[in-house]
Amino acid sequence: MTIHKKGQAHWEGDIKRGKGTVSTESGVLNQQPYGFNTRFEGEKGTNPEELIGAAHAACFSMALSLMLGEAGFTPTSIDTTADVSLDKVDAGFAITKIALKSEVAVPGIDASTFDGIIQKAKAGCPVSQVLKAEITLDYQLKS
């Protein structure tokens, strides 16, 4: 079974003065503004890197919940941040690293079991699998 989800972008103009909007099939994002100014100058709006970060954090959290459940554990909370690094390389830019940081509360799990599961979630998350950048993971098991 293949599931298809769609994101859409509209762009007008050159790279510095142009502007665009991004939308999602679900409507959660509906013509949200983005542009050079929101990506590089801190203006209000979104940018591709924060959208990738949000998608990666969400995917990782769900993968971790699934794998914990398969091992007989139910997390009470998973809070994940994905810090996406965009660096100047050669003549352009590249996402060079994504640092996942996750704080997780799981009753009854020991640190060794948790470490094995969270590392599998990092590798098994579909978004992790599609990204070429180095993906790091920092986590804290909350008691």
From Swiss-Prot:
Catalytic EC class: oxidoreductase
InterPro entries: KH_dom-like_a/b, OsmC/Ohr_fam, OsmC/Ohrsf, OsmC_Ohr_Peroxiredoxin, Peroxiredoxin_OsmC
Gene3D superfamilies with a match to the protein in the record: 3.30.300.20
N6-acetyllysine modifications at: 16
Predominant localisation class: cytoplasm
Induction: By elevated osmotic pressure in the growth medium.
Catalytically driven reaction(s): a hydroperoxide + [protein]-dithiol = [protein]-disulfide + an alcohol + H2O
Coiled-coil blocks: none
Spans annotated as Disordered: 1-27
Single GO BP term: hyperosmotic response
Disulfide bond annotation, renumbered to this chain: none
GO CC terms: cytosol
Key words, A-Z: Acetylation, Antioxidant, Cytoplasm, Oxidoreductase, Peroxidase
Cellular location(s): Cytoplasm
EC number: 1.11.1.-
GO molecular function, one term: protein homodimerization activity
Job description of the protein: Preferentially metabolizes organic hydroperoxides over inorganic hydrogen peroxide.
Family: Belongs to the OsmC/Ohr family.
Name of protein: Peroxiredoxin OsmC
Gene name of the record: osmC
